[in-house]
Amino acid sequence: VLADGRPVTSSRENTYITNTTFGGGYSFTTAVQKGFENGVEFYFGYTNMEQRDVAAMTSAQHSSSYGYQPRGYGEIVPAARSSFMNEHKFVLALSYTTQIIGDNDTTFSLLGIRKSGEPHSITFGGDSFNGSGRDGYDLAYIPTGVNDPNVVFASADVANEVMAFVNSKGCISAYAGTIIPRNTCDNPWQGRIDLRITQEIKLGDNGHKLVGYFDIQNLYNLLSNSRGWAQEVNYNVSRAIDIDGADDSGRYLISGVDTDDSYFYSTANGQSMWQINFGLAYRF
């Protein structure tokens, strides 16, 4: 057992999977929608979500899902906020339909989305104490200060850098003197605006028509290179506090801090970049 009460477990022998009654949550959505005679349509929606789980199950095999589970007290793994939830999400849609070319419809549409970031965990960067065989998944012990009796800083500079990082984030400093629970911090908020312009051209009186469209996805990012980014944490784990194991008294040997560990700008599904698309469809 280490100085803060964390158990040190040996390498795993067998992995046993069973169901649990812990965890759960809710999702609440409200929306308003209105169309006007002048061709304007409006939609606004808000979703509030709270989901808790015991294991994120981020891998295809149970052994690696076990190993990639951030933990602080050995096999005691309480339910925590899910890695896949966004607590707040706002959706705003506006459209305007008019006739510019004869009696053919021209539609201008804007879609805006703003949502809070997914939760992530703060762990140690260094050798594992939890027996999973995978480094970087020990939930970090948060020092109370430069003289915390449960840690040994490599130098005064390291102590000051670590404490500056801890005190800069309320989601971390709130757990000073303890092992921080899983998924206490959040990724930054994300937002984007998409624009679509469609033009219909009727082909006779039989209902056939050509529909051309012009899309700008992530208009935010096109207008400003510093906007429209989706910043995430890889596998929802930030190995922010570096350690070189523990001494004979069970005190953590803290060697540094990496405030940006595992942060990246996601490009999945077109995030963090702008795109322009043209298209033509024939409808009949």
Report each predicted region and the residues it spans.
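Short, solvent-exposed micro-motifs at the edges of structured domains
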Residues: 1-284
